[in-house]
Amino acid sequence: FAQKKQPENTPSPIDTGEILRAVVGIETTVPANTRTARALGTERNGNGIIIDNEGLVLTIGYVILEADSVNIVKPDGKKIPAKIVGYDHNTGFGLVRAIKPLNLKPIRMGKSADLFAGKRVLIVSHEGELPVMAAQVVSRRPFAGYWEYLLDSAIYTIPPFPKYGGAALIGVGGRLLGVGSLVVSD
């Protein structure tokens, strides 16, 4: 039988199961005497996104900042110890690496430069009643996180997402385009 060729610019179908498995939980413990413990707490939870086959996980930095213990929570609930690889003060991103194999496929990377106001996206978290939510980019503008970083072109989306810390911002074709940080009122 004949098949019609799909145009080059048509996005590939999204495998939501694959995306959901690439978004994991991050649990950290921070000593009470650290600079950030009072404001951010000593037990922090967030999301992380598997970005390579060696257990490298991208998250938002405040989840891991000053942590002395890090666990990655897999989709099946199993906790895998991890080590902090780095924290980028320019972007506010953090990286951790699993000590044991995760045996999970990494997410495909996209280009956040392709996002502009009006674009539809998905926000994906590790947990919650609704781990996936449709959203829309409302603007790209500067963001000053006085405690951490300054972004020239932060991505602002609506509606607000309850499990935002380290959540994956997914674009057309199922590619990672951003990492959730916080909810702002404007």
Question: Where do the protein language model's features map onto the residues?
Answer:
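Active-site region of chymotrypsin-like
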Residues: 22, 26-37, 41, 99-106, ...
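Short secondary-structure boundary/capping segments
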Residues: 15-16, 85-86, 147
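N-terminal activation segment of mature serine protease catalytic domains
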Residues: 2-49, 53-62, 69, 116-121
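C-terminal cap/linker of serine protease catalytic domains
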Residues: 3-16, 104, 123, 129-133, ...
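Conserved hydrophobic positions within beta-strands
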Residues: 48-50, 82-84, 137-139, 169
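Conserved active-site neighborhood of the chymotrypsin/trypsin-like protease fold
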Residues: 31-33, 52-132, 154, 159, ...
